[in-house]
Amino acid sequence: MDDYMVLRMIGEGSFGRALLVQHESSNQMFAMKEIRLPKSFSNTQNSRKEAVLLAKMKHPNIVAFKESFEAEGHLYIVMEYCDGGDLMQKIKQQKGKLFPEDMILNWFTQMCLGVNHIHKKRVLHRDIKSKNIFLTQNGKVKLGDFGSARLLSNPMAFACTYVGTPYYVPPEIWENLPYNNKSDIWSLGCILYELCTLKHPFQANSWKNLILKVCQGCISPLPSHYSYELQFLVKQMFKRNPSHRPSATTLLSRGIVARLVQKCLPPEIIMEYGEEVLEEIKNSKHNTPRKKTNPSRIRIALGNEASTVQEEEQDRKGSHTDLESINENLVESALRRVNREEKGNKSVHLRKASSPNLHRRQWEKNVPNTALTALENASILTSSLTAEDDRGGSVIKYSKNTTRKQWLKETPDTLLNILKNADLSLAFQTYTIYRPGSEGFLKGPLSEETEASDSVDGGHDSVILDPERLEPGLDEEDTDFEEEDDNPDWVSELKKRAGWQGLCDR
């Protein structure tokens, strides 16, 4: 600490304090995070992970790491100071005046670039929110606060420990399911929605209704003056099934964001980190399959046309009457050729349908009665890969023996029971909680002037676990590999920490 002079405190949280400091020799300003070190060795190691991860993240859209050291029972992380404040402050300063779309998309593109970088490094941020997005006076946007981040063992893994701020948490975490990089995309969508509306996407008067609204994924539409592409982008990021959400790479290589990477960002920023993304954009273009044409037919047609043109050139010196007769003959021959081709196509099609030596098989377009008959009285069961009975024409039964970890897919009911009588201060430092006797609203920093409704479309019954939630989609980042963890069940951990072991049994 001797090399730094503390100027003032710029933030405070459960971790400790954030200080604005000045380096004694260079007079340069830095932000310093002061973290109280726990007494246990394992917890101390976890606290040190933030410094280790941040030191690896060298990117213009990520808060730069300078150094870290320990003194007097505290860990100090010195990092770049962003003189424009955080995004939450910027949103609140608007006081109801909406941001222009080009500004929103410029900020969002830079956020995507930062998130894409950490995902390429196999890191999940796990607490992306407006307070953790920082601005500089020259227009740069930077992702910060890696205190909740997690390094996965491989790029195709899932994490399973609950971390995050409730307003930005995706449905799969509330449902106690493993999650991957797509949880960060949901949180990024929450920030984009806040930039467009100056409000949280999900607002409620209680934990119960907040969780139910998030699990349903229903949001109010954006203001109508924003473009259709922007509104579609928000909807894509709020897909309940994680595999249906775009990855950061996909966001940067398609649509309006892709155009911004090349056109709207300053040239010096593109020179710094844009080459990789621009290359991905080029590779992603023109991937849609096109209708195939018969090249031999094209060559025949071109040959016929060429010979016709040559004949016309040779006879060009003939009389006007000869030219007219030539044209009439050409028209008649063309009509006859078209008629012959149509008849020929019909006969060829009939021959193909009846020919036994086809390259492509013609599948019968009827209901598969055999399969329906076999499955008519079968019970619907989850199964593994080992068959005990493989008799033809019967339903195969599978054993439950498996070497694969079976995740406990709890419904949000368990969580709701735990939080039934919970103190709303568990919503972390991000939120302003009304004290008892003041209507008990669960409020976020952007819901001070709003009274959220407790109505939830569809009630409890509409919150149904999607059995294909973790099935791989088209995005190559989606996998079905799980991350090993000593404590995969965050709901049980929540019970333990809150001292509510017997609450659910009441």
Curated annotation (Swiss-Prot):
Protein localization: Cytoplasm; Cell projection, Axon
Tissue and organ distribution: Up-regulated in malignant versus normal breast tissue. Isoform 2 shows a high level of expression in testis, ovary and brain.
GO terms of biological process kind: cell division; mitotic cell cycle; protein phosphorylation
Cofactor section: Mg(2+)
Binding site for ATP: 10-18, 33
Any single GO CC term annotated in Swiss-Prot or TrEMBL for this entry: cytoplasm
Activity regulation details: Prolactin stimulates its activity.
Predominant location: cytoplasm
Assembly with partners or alone: Interacts with PXN, PRLR, VAV1 and VAV2 and this interaction is prolactin-dependent.
UniProt protein name: Serine/threonine-protein kinase Nek3
Species this protein is from: Homo sapiens
Gene name as annotated: NEK3
